[in-house]
């Protein structure tokens, strides 16, 4: 059986990246929460 996680750089960025987060209002809320929490890394 193959493993379920087959990493791809492009897919990771397009689904979870900073620009994707910034492109929607809810995504911006995610970034705001992570800034407030003090996350060192905001997005993938």
UniProtKB/Swiss-Prot annotation:
GO molecular function: structural constituent of ribosome
Gene Ontology CC annotation, any one: ribonucleoprotein complex
Xref: PROSITE patterns: RIBOSOMAL_L34
The keyword Ribosomal protein is annotated on this UniProt entry: yes
GO biological process: translation
Record's keyword annotation contains Lipid biosynthesis: no
Superkingdom as given in the UniProt entry: Bacteria
Span list, region Disordered: 1-44
Disulfide bonds, paired cysteine numbers: none
One Pfam short name: Ribosomal_L34
Keywords, alphabetical: Ribonucleoprotein, Ribosomal protein
InterPro entries the UniProt entry points to: Ribosomal_bL34, Ribosomal_bL34_CS
Compositionally biased spans, kind Basic residues: 1-22, 30-44
Protein family according to the UniProt entry: Belongs to the bacterial ribosomal protein bL34 family.
Protein known as: Large ribosomal subunit protein bL34
Species whose genome carries this gene: Pediococcus pentosaceus (strain ATCC 25745 / CCUG 21536 / LMG 10740 / 183-1w)
Biological classification of the source: Bacteria, Bacillati, Bacillota, Bacilli, Lactobacillales
